[in-house]
Amino acid sequence: MIKIYDTMTRSLQDFIPLNEGKVNMYVCGPTVYNYIHIGNARSVVAFDTIRRYFEYCGYQVNYISNFTDVDDKIIKGAAEAGMDTKSFSDKFISAFMEDVAALGVKPATKNPRVIDYMDEIIDFVKVLVDKEFAYEANGDVYFRVSKSHHYAKLANKTLEDLEIGASGRVDGEGEIKENPLDFALWKSAKSGEVSWESPWGKGRPGWHIECSVMATEIFGDTIDIHGGGADLEFPHHTNEIAQSEAKTGKTFANYWMHNGFVNVDNEKMSKSLGNFITVHDMLKSVDGQVIRFFLATQQYRKPVNFTEKAVHDAEVNLKYLKNTFNLPIQENANDEELEQFVKAFQGAMDDDFNTANGITVIFEMAKWINSGHYTSRVKETFAELLEIFGIVFQEEVLDADIESLIEQRQEARANRDFATADRIRDELAKQGIKLLDTKDGVRWTRD
């Protein structure tokens, strides 16, 4: 059985879906005002791998990841670029889709956009106001945190803890809010900003309400899994829970999953710190599968330290797996140990999707394959396990000229003409073809 570390309970929980054989996943997507960096990609790759493993286990996965296309950063970026907000966000949505495709990420079942749910957002806020979980102040609408008795349970904090932390913060909003912790559901329009008509005047939604509305509109009141980066635990996911459960009176998500950061020199990679590299730029020099494999080297909840050496190591290791995949089939080989590797791999992934341990099993399997156990059945299974990580290798076919040289070398060796055999071997090496003579014949790998 798959076990998931649930942030809400701070413990491993058996995964029991709402509907047998089906998984509903909502993963917070990007705010589309810039290219995504490697830290952003961690979440995309981690949850794509989790989705793929569910599918490998036979589940039908409804995977939703949104685009936040109404936001202060988008408004600011569009103004600086001299573009309207929709054209500006469209540009970065297209860039995002290109980047994640290069990382081998499967298309989501749906990528909802905030601008397509404005009526539903307004209706959601109206319900909260009617139930007195929200109040209007000068055209803004705020969620009344004091009425949410278990507020911040996801972040393992009490309301008192948060109030102490917020007591020193004074800003323009604080003068009209009942409580410094109250958060905006609807923001009144400012001059020149995109806005929509509402019962409280022209304005636009707050960030947190957007995901609650899209998730419940698509999945209903309760979903199986809600995921995102660890930085979303508070306040974003905390506020999603508060407003969603205030409206429905039901549990918003049964499992909360949060991925760790990509760090640079032990600090979180982020745009605000300026210590980031975009996927768009990195793809100019590094293959997307290498980036993805690098991100999978740690279990999704643990941080990944970004260094040139770590990326290089991922490239070398991926090349080894590719060469293993392209070894010639030996149908008479003994493959009885195959099920042991499959069982070990499943054990690793069932344990909260431990990709680090899963990769260890794959390398042990590759070593076993290289020792002469590569049947068609083994190759099919090897490819199937790699695909869970989004790694798909194409069958490599040698050029006729290279195949001819390998055959000539074999003949030279058979005739004990080792000088010719060595010359051909060196010539092939210059073309990136490395030969290995075994008791079962010659094998080749691409260097």
UniProtKB/Swiss-Prot annotation:
Binds 1 zinc ion per subunit. The keyword Cytoplasm applies. One of its GO terms (biological process) is cysteinyl-tRNA aminoacylation. It comes from the Bacteria. ATP binds at residue 271. Its cofactor is Zn(2+). Zn(2+) binds at residues 28, 211, 236, 240. A motif ('KMSKS' region) lies at residues 268-272. A motif ('HIGH' region) lies at residues 30-40. It is found in: Cytoplasm. Its main location: cytoplasm. Keywords: Aminoacyl-tRNA synthetase, ATP-binding, Cytoplasm, Ligase, Metal-binding, Nucleotide-binding, Protein biosynthesis, Zinc. CDD domains: CysRS_core (cd00672). Pfam families: CysS_C, DALR_2, tRNA-synt_1e. SMART domains: DALR_2. GO terms for cellular component: cytosol. Monomer. Belongs to the class-I aminoacyl-tRNA synthetase family. PANTHER family: CYSTEINE--TRNA LIGASE, CYTOPLASMIC, CYSTEINYL-TRNA SYNTHETASE. This is Cysteine--tRNA ligase. It comes from Streptococcus agalactiae serotype Ia (strain ATCC 27591 / A909 / CDC SS700). The lineage of its organism: Bacteria, Bacillati, Bacillota, Bacilli, Lactobacillales.
